[in-house]
């Protein structure tokens, strides 16, 4: 109470009324006079609040949020990022620590280890709920590089059952060919079946053969590649000319046949050049000629030139087989094929226009002259010198490598001759008749019923045996240098595609087209 007898304003406020209204008896607590209780009851405390609520407890709850709203404001002042966009950086520090890298290393074990890795990340309790899905995603990421490392290092270590099979298949040797297949068919079309036997490796030697009809090209290529003289000729990889075919005067090989050995040596057997049987087949069977050729003999010669020019471009070694010495038309044909051969200049010399620079970058294979079915007098030193001298004079203007890479003197075929016996030694090799070995099975006898003469010594033949000569020829051919065919190093498969482009270019060659017009 004040000195004037009135109550102070702060004594009968809301807090004061809360004290006497909570017990529930308002009569004895009315100390302000007869109208004081009504004044206190009608006082505009609730009207000023404009809430319409008569419960005092609600007023207290309305103030408490105001009081509680201050601590969040104070809390927001302490951390600088208090706004909602600050939430994304929160998981970022969770990814920065290396705690997530530990389950990656442990993820190499069983899958149960991934579940055990989640309690390790309990340091930040709020992201415990999203941590498992992140752990699963992060656990899947390291499994991929680990899988790749295992494949690179181990080769056969892989979780699936097919990977060991693939790894073992890569370690297995390539499939061995049992017979030759077509590289160019009888219609002079390219065949793609040979690429299945090729690999991606660069150590490959390509050997081709040229020769007239009936000289024994297929037999020589079979003996050099996979067969021996003791085997049946019907089992040769390159089918030789049968007796019936010889009687008819026909040719056995048509187009170009392909065979590759386990030593990665490619052998290309070809149809006979300038073949009369092919010409007879064109004339008698009324076979339609291509529109650019008018006469059958022109078409036969152009086919032969296309095959020879193709071999001069894609082969390391070209063997020219003859069965007698010698045919001058064969050397004219070789010079013509060299003239129309596709050029293979280096890219750095493509812009050069001088002929000398082009000759320096041109590719030419090794040329080997094989004298098949040689007689005894052919192995005479005097006759041997004449043969070398004649070939050297006929090929004097050729850029083909016809000398310096094969020698019969160095392989001890003529043990009594000195190395400098031949003034101009060319790549010439002599092989006798294969059937001559059968003559030694019946040694000469003095009489019909007498014992054989010189039974302990072999009969005189004037040359080594057929098997030994073929073996020496094979060793010399396989040991020849392998010059680079193009300006880039070619693998087996790259060589196949390169040969396909060369064959297509040979068929469309402008030089061959011009030469065919001159023949017509």
From Swiss-Prot:
Signal peptide region: none
Composition bias, Pro residues: 78-94, 122-133
Protein name per the record: Nonsense-mediated mRNA decay factor SMG9
Sequence positions bearing N-acetylserine: 2
Post-translation changes: Phosphorylated by SMG1.
Organism: Mus musculus (Mouse)
Family: Belongs to the SMG9 family.
Entry keywords, A to Z: Acetylation, Nonsense-mediated mRNA decay, Phosphoprotein
Role description: Involved in nonsense-mediated decay (NMD) of mRNAs containing premature stop codons. Is recruited by release factors to stalled ribosomes together with SMG1 and SMG8 (forming the SMG1C protein kinase complex) and, in the SMG1C complex, is required for the efficient association between SMG1 and SMG8. Plays a role in brain, heart, and eye development.
Disruption phenotype: Embryonic lethal. Homozygous null embryos show a range of abnormalities, including edema, hemorrhage, exencephaly, preaxial polydactyly, decreased size of the mid- and hindbrains, microphthalmia, thin myocardium, and cardiac septal defects. These phenotypes are variable among mutant embryos; there is evidence of incomplete penetrance, but most embryos show clear phenotypic abnormalities.
Composition-biased stretches (Basic and acidic residues): 36-53
InterPro entries: P-loop_NTPase, SMG9
Assembly and oligomerization: Self-associates to form homodimers and forms heterodimers with SMG8; these assembly forms may represent SMG1C intermediate forms. Component of the SMG1C complex composed of SMG1, SMG8 and SMG9. Interacts with DHX34; the interaction is RNA-independent.
A GO term for molecular function: identical protein binding
Keyword Phosphoprotein: yes
UniProt GO BP: brain development; eye development; heart development; in utero embryonic development; nuclear-transcribed mRNA catabolic process, nonsense-mediated decay
PTM-bearing positions, type Phosphoserine: 2, 4, 7, 32, 53, 451
Spans annotated as Disordered: 1-143
